[in-house]
Amino acid sequence: MLGAHGMREKNVFYEESSHVPLMIKMPHEIKKKTTVNGYVSNVDLFATIMDYLNVGNYKSDGESLRDLIEQKQTNHGNYVVTEWDYRGPIQPNYMIVKDGWKLMIPYTEDSKVLNVLYNLNEDPHEMTNLLGKNPNRKKYKKKAEKLRLKLLEWLKKNNSKHYDGVSKRKLI
């Protein structure tokens, strides 16, 4: 992070750390200078490689990006989730980004860590937390709850042990 947000580490959910370019080179398969914009994740890499190698019957939590890369598909997903479970509930453990909005939340109901909501369309440098100590935070409760519901859907799909903590967490 090199000092952004007063931090020098990479294990946080700010854009400088979590929004990184994904570059794939596969001669004779992927056209040079192909650019794809959208929500993708590292978890999709394995499935993409296996797809390009024509390996069938593999298990993966991700989905192949091949149709997106080859422009047979225009939208891979409408949100992305990132999780961090190294230090416990002393920092946000989950991040969900959807439609230019980002929610960061710990996985326990009683963590002292502030919930964080950013409108990346208006605040791309994430300088104003719309939740936390913001006096106007109630105005953003509906948006935060919508993001949390999408996160809970993802947690359930992935059989996360943190589903209950995230669902019981007070947002405002």
Predicted regions and their residues:
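Acidic-residue sensor for enzyme active/binding pockets
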Residues: 15-16, 83, 126
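Short, hydrophobic secondary-structure boundary micro-motifs
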Residues: 32-34, 61, 77-78, 127-130, ...
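C-terminal cap/loop subdomain of S1 sulfatases and analogous C-terminal strand-loop tails that border
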Residues: 1-4, 43-46, 51-116, 158-163, ...
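Active-site rim elements
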Residues: 9, 29-40, 52-56, 115, ...
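Histidine-centered active-site microenvironments of extracellular/periplasmic hydrolases
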Residues: 1-32, 41
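Long, internal low-complexity/basic segments
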Residues: 19, 41, 130-172
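A short aromatic-rich beta-strand->coil structural motif
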Residues: 22-23, 49, 97-138, 147
